[in-house]
Amino acid sequence: MYLQLLKSLNRLHPRAWDFVQLSRMDRPIGIYLLLWPTLVAVWIAGNGSPSLKNVLIFALGVVLMRAAGCCINDFADRKVDGHVKRTADRPLASGRVKPREAVMLFALLVGVSFLLVLCTNATTVWLSFGAVALAFCYPFMKRYTYYPQVVLGAAYSWGIPMAFTAAGGELPASAWLLYIANLLWTVGYDTYYAMVDRDDDLKIGVKSTAILFGEADRVIILTLQLLSLGCLLLAGNRFDLGGWYHLGLLAAAACFAWEFWSTRKLDRESCFKAFLHNHWAGMLIFIGVVLDYALR
């Protein structure tokens, strides 16, 4: 249904599908992975009753900024994507979209996102510049460092402090526990993603934590996930979250255990499935937060 709706945009313009693929709107997994921790922060910052305005601003902001990040990512990778089996048919790599068109779409999406942020307050507006900087820098990091996933984690977590300042204008120290938790979680699941392309990346000189971790990859990922849960547990104690929240964390831990077990053969398909599976972990934690506030 969702994909059919997107494909129907071709009736409006013959190249619409190319830009849908460029912004990765046809693959919403990235939206989910960014949305759940952001909504967790929105809910906690709003003490379980966030304003509808803030929910809409951050939900739409997630969709727009994730799309913007995909545009600039493909722009940065346009000369290497053609050498990787999974990415060879992307719009920029295949020549269906021009580099300047990708940059223009990136700017448009960032501009619309900024209009949303203007509906909050000055502190949140200033923080939003950090979000743009991280989104722009991340795609280029894989050329220079084995830690591009850390930069992605910082970018994917930036909505958390923004959610708190948007709710009350102040940023409590405990909010950074949520930030660190999400950064660690992001590094973990994006390492699974990088493991899919590891052989190709080694050939073309692209760096990643999957290459850095080597044979210890799954153990390190599980360690990062457990550390993330530890930070979430501490944050929950600081924000007086109880049983339902802890149940959500326990369910997420079960997801992480399944990912560790399912990737024991290190084949591409299982690593990609493990990456996708993190959507459920994020959703379960969010449900735990919502229920914990709603059932008090």
Curated annotation (Swiss-Prot):
One of its GO terms (cellular component) is plasma membrane. The keyword Transferase applies. Coiled coil: none annotated. Its main location: membrane. InterPro entries: HB_polyprenyltransferase-like (IPR006370), Prenyltransferase (IPR039653), UbiA_prenyltransferase (IPR000537), UbiA_sf (IPR044878). Pathway: Cofactor biosynthesis; ubiquinone biosynthesis. Catalyzes the prenylation of para-hydroxybenzoate (PHB) with an all-trans polyprenyl group. Mediates the second step in the final reaction sequence of ubiquinone-8 (UQ-8) biosynthesis, which is the condensation of the polyisoprenoid side chain with PHB, generating the first membrane-bound Q intermediate 3-octaprenyl-4-hydroxybenzoate. This is 4-hydroxybenzoate octaprenyltransferase. The gene is ubiA.
